Amino acid sequence: MANHKSAKKMIKVIAKRTLINKMRKSKTRTAIRNLVDIIKSGDKENVVLAFRNAESNLHKCVNKGVIHRNTAARKISRLNAKVKALMTA
């Protein structure tokens, strides 16, 4: 347990930031899941919008320091490959 005033404050700040980061990650995972579901259904009209949403959420997570930029780049690349495969099929 923290003894100093600043350490006690940091415990509160860390708890708050952790909650915000969990919300951001959850929102991003949901966007990715929605995109994958649309790809599986074969809906070519909505797949572009879903991809933009997922990509935007991933970039926001990178900018806020929630996930590493290489992780986001890898996920975006793999999702983009799936979208392209659907569009050409």
From Swiss-Prot:
Stated role: Binds directly to 16S ribosomal RNA.
Q: Which UniProt keywords apply?
A: Ribonucleoprotein, Ribosomal protein, RNA-binding, rRNA-binding
Q: Which GO terms describe its biological process?
A: translation
* Transferase listed as a keyword: no
Classification via InterPro entries: Ribosomal_bS20 (IPR002583), Ribosomal_bS20_sf (IPR036510)
Q: From which organism does this entry originate?
A: Wolbachia pipientis wMel
Name the Gene Ontology molecular function terms of this record. Answer: small ribosomal subunit rRNA binding; structural constituent of ribosome
Q: Which family does it belong to?
A: Belongs to the bacterial ribosomal protein bS20 family.
Under SUPFAM superfamilies, the record lists: Ribosomal protein S20
Name the lineage.
Bacteria, Pseudomonadati, Pseudomonadota, Alphaproteobacteria, Rickettsiales
- What are the record's GO terms for cellular component? cytosol; small ribosomal subunit
Can you say what this protein is called?
Answer: Small ribosomal subunit protein bS20
